[in-house]
């Protein structure tokens, strides 16, 4: 991690900071060119072991372990630890997360009152994330310097960066780590439910997916946040984020308001509005009144509207509507 310049009484002083320089951006990882040029035999062996074509194996390596950027003009950088472990074991595992438990990170997220969805698509200037962690005013320096988020875009005109989770390995691992703090101590039950929900959505069965979700939430212990509508939004965000082939975002801006949750699958785009102690019809009416569907008319996929109403006393879904 980055640290402040030491005092004039220290032997180590006047350090040159190279952490955001383009000419050093690929020094701490493996670029795609290095992967293809130096590890071709490893790729072929992995593909054969997994029953994949060479191109499919490369695509899965990129999906799982690529995506790091360390400067405004940075090559895509693979996580070297996970990449080498994958080649060694010939399996697409979550190796980086298996090497340690992010307990400190979770505690700091609570301290700074960071919600799980707050980690996605963060806009910041350089001083807000490339900064010493000992006196950080936000959690961004810790998230960035420990590898949980990375640079995904840079706006040169306005000099700000967009930060996000780098890849599937980090996304799934971090989401699983957040489950005990935000949903239930039973992480296995949550991941199994997410897997069954994914199977339903693959068949475009949102009705079955919501029934599974309701059954699952009926097993979750009561917590004090169930009277807060945003709590249910975060629960849905965590569970849907475990659906690894889906893009999930919350509080998505439209010309007429903000959609609670937007989820993009291979076949559909889902607009999800969450209400508490009202009814699903009210949620659906808001989607129509604010004309949320128009915002996504050019996405190229059928748009499905989903209104969900939660009962705060039960801490569970009361009813829903799907169109």
Question: Where on the chain are the PLM-derived regions?
Answer:
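Switch/connector loops and helix/strand junctions flanking conserved nucleotide-binding motifs
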Residues: 3-10, 280-283, 313-319
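Mg2+/Mn2+-dependent nuclease catalytic core
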Residues: 276-293
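Conserved catalytic cores of phosphodiester-cleaving nucleases, focusing on short active-site segments
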Residues: 236, 259-276, 290
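Domain-level recognition of nuclease-like catalytic cores that cleave nucleotide substrates
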Residues: 295, 299-323
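Hydrophobic/aromatic beta-strand patches that form the interior of the parallel beta-sheet core
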Residues: 16, 270-272, 304-308
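Active-site metal-binding core of divalent-cation-utilizing nuclease and nuclease-like domains
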Residues: 239-267
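Phosphate-binding site recognition
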Residues: 1-228, 243-244
């Amino acid at each position: 991690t980055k640290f402040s310049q030491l005092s004039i009484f220290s032997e180590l002083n006047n350090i040159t900071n190279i952490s955001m320089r383009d000419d050093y951006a690929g020094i701490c990882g493996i670029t795609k060119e290095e992967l293809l040029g130096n590890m071709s035999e490893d790729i072929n062996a992995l593909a054969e072991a997994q029953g994949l074509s060479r191109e499919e194996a490369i695509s899965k390596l990129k999906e799982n372990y690529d995506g790091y950027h360390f400067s405004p003009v940075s090559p895509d950088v693979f996580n070297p630890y996970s990449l080498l472990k994958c080649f060694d074991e010939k399996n697409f595992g979550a190796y980086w997360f298996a090497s340690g438990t992010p307990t400190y990170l979770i505690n700091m997220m609570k301290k700074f009152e960071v919600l799980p969805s707050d980690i996605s698509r963060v806009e910041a200037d350089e001083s807000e994330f490339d900064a010493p962690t000992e006196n950080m005013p936000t959690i961004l320096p810790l998230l960035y310097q420990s590898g949980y988020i990375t640079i995904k875009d840079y706006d040169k005109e306005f000099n700000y960066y967009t930060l996000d989770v780098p890849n599937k390995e980090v996304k799934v691992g971090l989401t699983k780590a957040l489950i005990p703090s935000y949903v239930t101590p039973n992480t296995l039950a949550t991941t199994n439910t997410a897997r069954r929900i994914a199977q339903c959505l693959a068949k475009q069965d949102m009705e079955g997916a919501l029934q599974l979700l309701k059954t699952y939430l009926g097993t979750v212990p009561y917590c004090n946040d169930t009277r807060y509508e945003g709590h249910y939004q975060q629960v849905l965000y965590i569970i849907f984020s475990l659906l690894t082939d889906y893009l999930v975002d919350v509080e998505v801006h439209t010309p007429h308001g903000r959609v609670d949750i937007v989820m993009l699958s291979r076949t559909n785009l889902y607009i999800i509005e969450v209400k508490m102690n009202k009814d699903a019809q009210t949620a659906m009416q808001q989607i129509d009144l604010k004309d949320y569907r128009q915002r996504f008319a050019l996405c190229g996929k059928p748009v499905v509207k989903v209104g969900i109403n939660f009962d705060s006393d039960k801490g569970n879904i009361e009813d829903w509507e799907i169109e």
